[in-house]
Amino acid sequence: MTHVTEPVVNSAPKPMTPLQEFWHYFKRNKGAVVGMVYVVLMLIIAIGANVLAPHAPAEQFRDALLRPPVWQEGGSWQFILGTDDVGRDVLSRLMYGARLSLLVGCLVVALSLVLGVIFGLLAGYFGGVVDVLIMRIVDIMLALPSLLLALVLVAVFGPSIVNASLALTFVALPHYVRLTRAAVLVEVNRDYVTASRVAGASSARQMFVNILPNCLAPLIVQASLGFSNAILDMAALGFLGMGAQPPTPEWGTMLSDVLQFAQSAWWVVTFPGVAILLTVLAFNLMGDGLRDALDPKLKQ
């Protein structure tokens, strides 16, 4: 008696969800994963600074002025990264400074992204006079150095963390306008937009419901890179005395306050500088990974 073996049919692999597909391509970029881990760590530190920081950011220890880090001769576990010229704990101020830097980055990116998307949609969808007017203003703004323009705005309205954030929002706005407009011009003549227009969809529905979701990928990447630019520019404004004012624990202001001690007490300038460097680098690496994961051309 012969046995007939039935052929085994392998089932097709289950398609990945959008989130699974995103993570599949994102994790290929090891630098992006490292950057994301660092950003998550910074978020935890910023949120839990009240609990994690060993001291208050403005607390002064007059008997421990310019105390070196714990691993250097004269250091103490009470001040792991040393103290500054008035006896404030460097580690605690770095932790609270992370909160302020990330908060400013969120504010600048959120405001510039929302306004840039609105103006970019208007320019790309309506075209004509609206497009010419918006894009000529954008061209004028881009013709000026961004940091110089921010400095002028802060000088006019007065140095403060709020005015510096609004100035950085203003100088970041043109990049989102141009990017949104370019993406809209690609989508506006596609069949689904034409069909929706024939069906009687309003201009607002066309822009914000039909077109905008298909333009989000490059905007997400730009927002990630804009986050690092906002942190770096805020540190530059703080260093020049036009951002956060002492004794606010902001990384750029920390550098400016102790610059005269750079040679005698290296730690007071090194650690804030390293914090700025690593944070900006982490957001840039993460933005590179987001581009790899969201750009269809790079997936092929």
Sequence positions of predicted segments:
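Residues marking the start of alpha-helices
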Residues: 22, 77-79, 153
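Short, strongly hydrophobic transmembrane alpha-helices
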Residues: 31-50, 117, 277
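Hydrophobic alpha-helical transmembrane segments of membrane transport/permease proteins
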Residues: 37, 45-83, 240-248
